[in-house]
Amino acid sequence: MPNKALITGFWSKVKVDEVGAEALGRLLVVYPWTQRFFEHFGDLSTADAVLGNAKVKAHGKKVLDSFSNGVQHLDDLKGTFAQLSELHCDKLHVDPENFRLLGNVLVVVLARHFGKEFTPELQAEFQKVVAGVASALAHRYH
């Protein structure tokens, strides 16, 4: 179980709109096969196009708003993400591996934004959280 106080204290400093936009943008650039779920977002042909895309930024914020909800409910991630798991499995048919990839990209973005403040101890705690969220989102697939 992650250290709740450490996670929630740090998370309160995160600018969800900026970090969410960058995390989703990086996911789409670093793992371009994930773009197939976002073809309706328009031009995703280059890194600059992806990172400057208003729909990517807006959806990144939406994703991180949901993640923020998970941070507030670390004891019940499966329940917190049950509806999103159902949506991504049954309707969108998203490969559950993408949840793990996004979690890892999120950790990279947090490290980039917070530098030395994102200590190895904090990273270890966040790895637990992103793994828990990825597992909760993949729950419907099992």
From Swiss-Prot:
Database matches in InterPro entries: Globin, Globin-like_sf, Globin/Proto, Hemoglobin_b, Hemoglobin_oxygen_transport
Domain Globin: 2-142
GO biological process, one term: hydrogen peroxide catabolic process
GO cellular component, one term: haptoglobin-hemoglobin complex
PROSITE patterns the UniProt entry points to: GLOBIN (PS01033)
Tissue expression summary: Red blood cells.
Keyword Heme: yes
Chain residues that bind heme b: 59, 88
MF (Gene Ontology): haptoglobin binding; heme binding; hemoglobin alpha binding; metal ion binding; organic acid binding; oxygen binding; oxygen carrier activity; peroxidase activity
Keywords from the UniProt entry: Heme, Iron, Metal-binding, Oxygen transport, Transport
Recorded family membership: Belongs to the globin family.
Function: Involved in oxygen transport from the lung to the various peripheral tissues.
Official protein name in the record: Hemoglobin subunit beta-C
Native source species: Ovis aries (Sheep)
